[in-house]
Amino acid sequence: MSQQTNVSVSAQTICKIGIYFALLVVSSKVAIPIPFYDYISLQTAFIFLIYPILGAKYGSWLTVLYLVSGLLGLPIFASGGGLGYIFKTTFGFLIAFTLMPFLAAVVRKGNKLFSHHQFLNTLVSNYICLIMDHLIGFAYKCFIIKFYIGDIINVTGILGFTSLLDFLIDVGLIFFVTLAELQIIKRIH
């Protein structure tokens, strides 16, 4: 006899996942291309709103669903979609998005540096996750540029400059996202 596993997901949770999926797609389309294989988009900032609201489990489901849907051909990423997107320099950031809910859960549990101040605690946790996201994204970008595109010159200074610009803009966005995140959490709990 086989054992049945009862998986119960509320209709409200399914609706939240659907709404946040649509909002994630919209946020990825709000993108400004910058030189040397990079984009500045609202997608990274929006990712930081998904996990606190949906939690690590459903946040992961959402990002995996987003990644798989894009790889299957839906044009939902910043510059399209399809299986060939794994050869885009920005695909590493999408990989990092799927890991972020678990990292965020671990970092937020372990971060007691500012336990008396919720904003600082959340901001530091978000910045740690942002650094992880950019490290994975930058490493993947360098790998693709060097081994797939074969452009060794851009892996140096100019690529570093555009990646730094992208990171600094994300640092500013995450500050405001943290403010919004705390307000949203306060209202839904």
Briefly describe each language-model feature range.
Residues 1-6, 12-13, 17-19, 26, ...:
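Short helix-perturbing small/polar motifs within transmembrane alpha-helices
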Residues 44, 48, 62-70, 84-85, ...:
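Alpha-helical transmembrane segments of multi-pass membrane proteins, especially transporters
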Residues 32-45, 66-76, 108-122, 180-184:
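Hydrophobic alpha-helical transmembrane segments
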Residues 28-39, 67-100:
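Interfacial aromatic-anchored transmembrane helix boundaries in multi-pass membrane proteins
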Residues 9-13, 37-38, 78, 82-83, ...:
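Helix-boundary and loop/linker segments of multi-pass membrane transporters
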Residues 2-62:
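Hydrophobic transmembrane alpha-helices
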Residues 36, 115-189:
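Membrane-embedded alpha-helical hairpins and interfacial helices in multi-pass inner-membrane proteins
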Residues 24, 28, 51, 70, ...:
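Structural signal for membrane-spanning alpha-helices in multi-pass inner-membrane proteins
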